Structures are given as C-alpha cells and as structure tokens.
C-alpha cells in the first residue's frame, strides 16, 4: 500500500481519497478508523453535574418518557439530544436496535433470539440488557457483520 500526503493551503476542508482495485477488509477498517476519530464529544448529565465520558464506555442509549439516557455498566446519565440526532453523529459501532434504543455493539457479548423474531443483547460485566425489535434485527445483523 502506498501513502501520499499533499499539502494545499488553498483547501478549506481536509479531503481523503483512497484509490484501490476493490474494497478490501483493510480499506473498510481504515474507513472505520477514520470515521471514529471524528466522534463527537457529548455532555452527559446526572443531578447537577456534567460528565464527559468516552463513548466506548456507553453500553446503550434509551428513551424513558421524554428523556434520553446513556447507560454505562453501573450508571445512567441524561443526554440532551434526541435519538435520531444521536444516531446521525455516533460512530458506526452504535446501532439502532429498537424504536427507543441505540446499542454499542462492541460492548455486547451475546444476542439471544426468540422464536418471535425479537432478541436481547447482553453486555460485558453488567446485568443490563436491551431488547432488539424484529424491525431492527436485520440492521443489527448487518452492523455486527461489518464490525467483526
């Protein structure tokens, strides 16, 4: 693989172009890595405090009433964004799994499927689980395939 960097002071935005004969796993990994480096810095709220957590610590985001909560292994923090806003800015390792939940698929260790077509994601080192609806089952499967 060849790498070339061109400096152009006239550019207003950085552009990355990858030329290849085919889309390989190596190129897909590189694309994923580049996308994850621009992950947003979210503010999480609990009580009167503001917290700045690493997105990798978040297991899932879910709605509860009119509020959105981000769950870690032990805590839950309020996020002042809507799920569709989060979905558009979160890295690719977050996947919509139901109408009310976005899960960090890197933190999940199993997906148990039921006969009705729904499922449950279990996370490492916690009792917390999330429901996967039938509607989002194929999206989750595709995202897991792309991540592994």
Predicted regions and their residues:
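A broadly conserved detector of short glycine/acidic/proline-rich loop/turn motifs that flank catalytic sites
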Residues: 9, 22, 48, 83, ...
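N-terminal regulatory/sensing modules of transcriptional regulators
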Residues: 1-28
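N-terminal low-complexity, intrinsically disordered tails enriched in Ser/Pro/Gly
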Residues: 146-148
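C-terminal structural segments of small proteins and small subunits
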Residues: 127, 131-132, 138-139
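Conserved binding/recognition cores within well-folded domains
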Residues: 26-125, 129
